[in-house]
């Protein structure tokens, strides 16, 4: 977990406290959106954010997984038809 904390940071004065890759202003959400669009890890670091490493891209995924595991989500149940 400490390695993840070294790769992802949250600072109230950077992107309004949204999680970013440490030492950058690149948000975790930006990277996840590229992955969702089908962009590969390699393409992210070669074409979109050359200052990043593939390890940092993977850290964004690990961070998202950690958030899902640590939070409770409540959804309204739909009534059966």
Regions found by a protein language model. Give the residues of each.
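Long, charge-rich, low-complexity alpha-helical segments
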Residues: 27-81
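N-terminal first-folded block
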Residues: 1-26
């Amino acid at each position: 977990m400490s390695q993840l904390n070294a790769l992802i940071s949250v600072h109230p004065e950077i992107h309004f406290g949204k999680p970013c890759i440490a030492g950058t202003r690149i948000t975790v959400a930006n990277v996840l959106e590229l992955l969702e669009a089908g962009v590969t890890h390699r393409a992210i670091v070669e074409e979109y954010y050359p200052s990043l490493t593939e390890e940092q891209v993977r850290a964004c995924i690990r961070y998202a997984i950690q958030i899902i595991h640590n939070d409770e989500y409540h959804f309204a149940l739909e009534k059966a038809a």
